[in-house]
Amino acid sequence: MKNAFKDALKAGRPQIGLWLGLANSYSAELLAGAGFDWLLIDGEHAPNNVQTVLTQLQAIAPYPSQPVVRPSWNDPVQIKQLLDVGAQTLLIPMVQNADEARNAVAATRYPPAGIRGVGSALARASRWNRIPEYLHLANDAMCVLVQIETREAMSNLASILDVDGIDGVFIGPADLSADMGFAGNPQHPEVQAAIENAIVQIRAAGKAPGILMANEALAKRYLELGALFVAVGVDTTLLARGAEALAARFGVEKKLSGASGVY
């Protein structure tokens, strides 16, 4: 068994990604052909469940883009279900300390290395027990990315990085900026300093730093600092802004207004 995304991170090859929030296999397949290295299927803030994640994994599978799945929480039951339908790389949200990071890793490993329940006869991941030695190969194919997005998590970063089985650490700029008192403004100098310091620290520890940043200049800055998996846009934002721009070119007055948002 292989995990091309995990292999790329280990080799130090920067991976450029796109966030998927439309919760739809048709749009997921459309974007899988766009050329991004990875696509994040979001189960935390988008209206996804195990079934919709499954259909998006199936839609992306024929393409070179690698799927990364974010569950709604660091929940071993939910993680087990996502792994069984074929997710190999998980982005675990709101990890605050080393114990929570260890719990995330344990949820992705079969015993005795972890607590993942054995149900391979029912699992797409094992091709319903058609992959020889799946139970003995699966642990090494798992890629665990933990998300730090508060001052508490930042203060515990060194101990999180010491946890065996953590492949990468993703900085959540929206929640981090809110926790630091700058909600909606991840470009605030204090937030940027925290992000940049974390990227350098993560890379120095031999782990892969990651982030979502739609600001092109900042995304490139993070890559220069050593970030290895950077999502540079969100499908919902691309669709909304693209549709608005097209309407505006034909003189259609925008009916709704609002904040531009973080992404």
Curated annotation (Swiss-Prot):
What name does the UniProt record give this protein?
Answer: 4-hydroxy-2-oxo-heptane-1,7-dioate aldolase
Keyword terms, alphabetized: Aromatic hydrocarbons catabolism, Lyase, Metal-binding
GO MF terms here are: 4-hydroxy-2-ketopimelate aldolase activity; aldehyde-lyase activity; metal ion binding
Name the gene that codes for it: hpcH
Family to which the UniProt record says this protein belongs: Belongs to the HpcH/HpaI aldolase family.
Source organism: Salmonella typhimurium (strain LT2 / SGSC1412 / ATCC 700720)
Q: Which residues bind a divalent metal cation?
A: E149, D175
Q: Where is this site: Transition state stabilizer?
A: R70
Can you name a GO cellular component term?
cytoplasm
Tell me where on the tree of life, at the top rank, the source sits: Bacteria
Q: Does Metal-binding count among this protein's keywords?
A: yes
Pathway listed for it? Aromatic compound metabolism; 4-hydroxyphenylacetate degradation; pyruvate and succinate semialdehyde from 4-hydroxyphenylacetate: step 7/7
Q: Name one GO biological process term.
A: phenylacetate catabolic process
Subunit comment: Homohexamer; trimer of dimers.
Q: Which NCBIfam families match?
A: HpaI
Disulfide bonding pattern of the chain:
none
Report the cofactors: a divalent metal cation
Which reaction does this enzyme catalyse, per its entry?
4-hydroxy-2-oxoheptanedioate = succinate semialdehyde + pyruvate
Binding-site list for substrate: Q147, A174, D175
